[in-house]
Amino acid sequence: MTRLQNLTTRQGERIAVVSGLRTPFARQATAFNGVPALDMGKMVVNEMLQELDFDPKLIEQVVFGQVVQMPEAPNIAREIVLGTGMHIGTDAYSVTRACATSFQAAANVAESIISGTIDIGIAGGADSSSVLPIGVSKKLAATLLALSKARTMSKRLKLLSTLSVKDLMPVPPAVAEYSTGISMGQTAEQMAKSHGITRQEQDALAYRSHTLAAKAWKDGLIRGEVMTAFPEPYGQWIDKDNNIREDSTLESYAKLRPAFDRKFGTVTAANSTPLTDGAAAILLMREGRAKELGLKPLGYIRSYAFSAIGVEQDMLMGPSYATPMALDRAGISLSDLTLIDMHEAFAAQTLANVKMFGSKKFAQENLGRSQAIGEIDMDKFNVLGGSLAYGHPFAATGARMITQTLRELQRRGGGFALNTACAAGGLGAAMILEAE
């Protein structure tokens, strides 16, 4: 049994989530086309502080993440500090844990508060699928380096003559695991086949996600956590996620062809998250400091856990490994939760994890536990829709989930909630939140 996690300061103060905000999430090459992740990160942090009328000089630490990193700005956190009016001496560093990046950022800030190093910090993440670090071939890179050292024109011409047309082709960022060459979509297909997840079940979950997200927006439940963004060159604005299918029918999902296994596959563009641009941030502080500043927290971080498993098979099963650890560390069980929010990278991955939560066999063989984690009550599950509908700017999703979950938990009168996500590299994250 995992030990209880005491996420309080020496004085017994909890880690408060005081505020959370995100940009609208936009499909690749749409509203944020040409806008770097860094700009979106600065945009959302600045807006969050302005909405609170919060002095940026009070921020003592920023931990931010970016999965698709740009070489010209490798430390996005520090650039956000420099671009938002914070004190020049504010500590800032960047993290990456693939799709669980902003959960890691939140955990790091929480640990700094617990240790007494800081009282106030910002965690979050931003990613752009529209502004990508397009590279060059290894041969061209080596030749360019040699050219910079060549002293004569004849040597330069000789080096250039060794290049072929293929060597000059741009190299886009990899979409597959470095160690295996397997993509996320291929893993989702494998999980669907291995765990008996049908095409109909996947399409039904995607339809549910979009329907619930559309209703949440229509009912005004999301408006308060999403800013209006005016991306350069400031000719247009966006104030709402543009991936949500507001008027789709379940039948329309069945029309799409499989994306990763054309002949026998069940994973399609409609039951997968799209490439997305966006940023999200949360403001964390010591509970007592929030009271001193007259700020009412959205809620508190009760526990968290991270997991790692093999990447050859079931690579996206991280929630099923991280969740029981987080529950144990919080001293609660699945049945104690008011809400469960699981990142929907793919409908297949989500449903496979839901299935494993209720599997005693999985718990015994993979978790070393005698009983299953627990059957998920779908009335508590992704009640406002999930990533299939909102989209998934990799590093921003965790912060979106934390803010969205705590706000909904408050509307329901408080209680405990689970946020959990799979991530590339066989990683997983789970966080238990509480609100009053």
Swiss-Prot record:
EC nos: 2.3.1.16
Species in which this protein is naturally found: Photobacterium profundum (strain SS9)
Annotated protein name in UniProt: 3-ketoacyl-CoA thiolase
One cellular component term from this protein's GO annotations in UniProt: cytosol
Reaction(s) this enzyme catalyzes, per UniProt: an acyl-CoA + acetyl-CoA = a 3-oxoacyl-CoA + CoA
Disulfide bonds: none
Gene Ontology molecular function, alphabetical: acetyl-CoA C-acyltransferase activity
Known pathway: Lipid metabolism; fatty acid beta-oxidation
UniProt subcellular location: Cytoplasm
Catalytic center residues: C99 (acyl-thioester intermediate), H392 (proton acceptor), C422 (proton acceptor)
Highest taxon in the source lineage: Bacteria
NCBIfam families according to UniProt: AcCoA-C-Actrans, FadI, PRK08963.1
Broadest EC class assigned to this enzyme: transferase
Primary location group: cytoplasm
Similarity section: Belongs to the thiolase-like superfamily. Thiolase family.
Biological function: Catalyzes the final step of fatty acid oxidation in which acetyl-CoA is released and the CoA ester of a fatty acid two carbons shorter is formed.
Entry keywords, A to Z: Acyltransferase, Cytoplasm, Fatty acid metabolism, Lipid degradation, Lipid metabolism, Transferase
